[in-house]
């Protein structure tokens, strides 16, 4: 299994246990799901049994996003201006990291990241933002949105901002 770890904070952000796809050569997207957790049990979202009708949440149970929950991601807030400021600084940090560790990928990163940032800014109100467990303000912000069906959530992380650790 591969774990995608933030190169700045070391936070684990995603794993290949989810169906990870590369987009624009710069971003990994993975569909996720809403699951019910509580009392030590995790409901993977299977249909309720026909006899019981609709299952009600048990005491202490809550519905959470499985990626956000599994990797202990923390919600954060941005307006468009503050996100633009953050993303410019983050892109500079990743570009410096790549110049030192993988100089051949700088151009591909710049091209793909620019295209994806434009996509995010174009539909800014639809996005949710999460930091890694350490809440490092210089590290990657995980992006969350919904597919065209309006019900399937997905997360997006920057390919060049993570290292893949095989476990």
UniProtKB/Swiss-Prot annotation:
GO terms, biological process: cytoplasmic translation; negative regulation of autophagy; negative regulation of microtubule depolymerization
Domain (TCTP): residue spans on this chain: 1-167
Protein keywords: Cytoplasm, Cytoskeleton, Microtubule, Protein biosynthesis
InterPro entries linked to this entry: Mss4-like_sf (IPR011057), Mss4/transl-control_tumour (IPR011323), TCTP (IPR034737), Translation_control_tumour_CS (IPR018103), Translational_control_tumour_p (IPR018105)
GO terms assigned for molecular function: calcium ion binding
GO cellular component: cytoplasm; cytosol; fungal biofilm matrix; microtubule; mitochondrion
Pfam families recorded: TCTP
Principal subcellular localization: cytoplasm
Subcellular location: Cytoplasm, Cytoskeleton
Protein's job: Involved in protein synthesis. Involved in microtubule stabilization.
Family that this chain belongs to: Belongs to the TCTP family.
Protein name from the UniProt record: Translationally-controlled tumor protein homolog
Organism of derivation: Candida albicans (strain SC5314 / ATCC MYA-2876)
Primary gene name: TMA19
């Amino acid at each position: 299994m591969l774990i995608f770890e933030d190169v700045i904070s070391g936070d684990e952000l995603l794993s290949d246990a989810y169906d990870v796809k590369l987009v624009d050569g710069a971003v990994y997207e993975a569909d996720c799901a809403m699951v019910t957790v509580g009392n030590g049990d995790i409901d993977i979202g299977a249909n309720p049994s026909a006899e019981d009708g609709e299952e009600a949440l048990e005491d202490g149970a809550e519905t959470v996003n499985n990626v956000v929950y599994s990797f202990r991601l923390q919600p954060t807030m941005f307006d468009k201006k503050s996100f633009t400021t953050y993303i410019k600084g983050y892109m500079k940090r990743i570009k410096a990291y790549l110049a030192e560790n993988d100089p051949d990928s700088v151009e591909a990163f710049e091209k793909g990241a620019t295209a994806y940032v434009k996509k995010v800014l174009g539909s800014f109100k639809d996005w949710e933002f999460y930091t890694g467990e350490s809440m490092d303000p210089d590290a990657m912000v995980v992006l969350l949105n919904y597919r065209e069906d309006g019900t399937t959530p997905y997360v997006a992380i920057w390919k060049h901002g993570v290292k893949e650790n095989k476990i």
